[in-house]
Amino acid sequence: MAAAVRKVTSPAALQESSLKYGEPLGDSHLRRVLSARLMALGVPAAPGQIITTVGATHALDIVSRTLLKAGDCVMVEEPGWAVEFARLDALGMRILPVPRRADGPDLDVMARYCGLHSPKLFVSVSVFHNPTGYCLSPGSAHRVLQLANAHNFHIVEDDTYSHIAPEHATRLCALDGLQRTIYVSGFSKILAPNWRVGYLAAPSALVERLLDTKLLATLTTPALLEKAMAWCID
């Protein structure tokens, strides 16, 4: 980490980067590294489909503000991260809790919600779900994707634990190929949580809308920290 910071804050590097804003999508070196990492997980995300964020929480917020409006129904696994419930509630969303089981979300509950409430989004932690530690089974994953296609809702997959999880673990974004799914992750669980470097990977058709939401909130993200992170993980 110290070596990466020294590299991006050298006089030559600072002269090049300090007098301009960062790239709207995020540092291109970091996005190339992340693209290769996602490809290894089976998630087909080109650098142009990746948007860097101020941590994974910011990525989740961008998705919500882009795809939802106040009053929309959102399915969220329960138990789950209290901040996610609070964040969606603050945005005026109607939260539909889905019990999390050992092999994935309760599919009967999801199907019932789909029939009664027409949810717009499902928020899921497929791998090392917090707090249960469970991982999604292939069978449950395929059924979740079938429900999403049949009832026209998007899925945001929070893969915050990806860097300590097996690459072969079942991920909705890999099975779906980033068609109806959006991938979210960050580095707080393995490296420099106070750098607040996160990212999302989305279907090409959604990238411009998601980027607009990012730009309206933060304009860009901290370029020096993104460059340092790229050197750390490359």
Show where each model-derived region lies.
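Conserved core of the PLP fold type I
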Residues: E16-N152, H163-L175, I182
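PLP-dependent aminotransferase class I/II
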Residues: I182-Y183, K189-D234
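Glycine-rich phosphate-binding segment of PLP-dependent enzymes
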Residues: M1-K20
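A generic short alpha-helical patch detector that favors 3-5-residue windows
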Residues: G26, C114, D176, A202, ...
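Amphipathic, well-packed alpha-helical segments that form the structural scaffold of globular domains
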Residues: R6, S10, S35-M39, V123, ...
